[in-house]
Regions:
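Intrinsically disordered, low-complexity Ser/Thr/Pro/Gly-rich regulatory segments
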Residues: 1-172
Length: 172
């Protein structure tokens, strides 16, 4: 814990803010007697930093980048399914993370809780459309999944989707 005047800020939280400033995500970080203040670099950064779901995506992104076995790691990739026949109707999907392992594409969806059947179907579609048998998808869920009783686990396994739950994340 650090004190600046009468304010006490958890050292871990303040170090995160200092890191965010160093990374130019925020600026004018200031701790006074009554408050800690800063400015976000832009609206997009603010929305990312205030959205709990983005933290799981960032956690996965950072770990994929650190691993160095994977390349072309990307976050929030949008797919546009438009063709000349459907000019008036825009059809898009977004996948949380994509990367390559060698020449094989991988697709990851990050969820705070067990997803809907529609979300699983969407995730299962990417490998067959973009890489066939050489492509894989994974679902990362913050909560722990009971593998014996979970519809999500059973359905994901049947669809060829690797499931990584909170218990596996904690193990590393």
């Amino acid at each position: 814990e650090i004190s600046k005047g009468n304010i006490k800020v958890s050292l871990g939280n303040f170090k995160l803010l200092e890191l965010a400033q160093k990374l130019k995500l925020i600026y004018k970080l200031n701790a006074s007697a009554n408050k800690v203040s800063f400015f976000y670099r832009d609206k997009k950064i603010k929305s990312y930093l205030c959205d709990f779901g983005i933290w799981l995506e960032l956690f996965c992104y950072i770990n994929l980048k650190r691993n160095r076995l994977f390349h072309d790691v990307r976050m929030s990739v949008k797919f546009e399914w438009n063709n000349t026949k459907r000019k008036l109707m825009e059809i898009t999907n977004e996948i949380d993370l994509t990367f390559f392992y060698g020449i094989h594409p991988y697709f990851i969806s990050c969820k705070l809780s067990e997803p809907s059947a529609d979300a699983l179907r969407e995730l299962s579609m990417y490998p067959s459309y973009f890489g066939g048998g050489n492509s894989k998808s994974a679902l990362v869920i913050v909560s722990k999944v009971n593998k014996e009783r979970s519809y999500t686990y059973t359905r994901a396994k049947d669809m060829g989707i690797t499931l990584i739950d909170g218990a596996m994340i904690k193990k590393g």
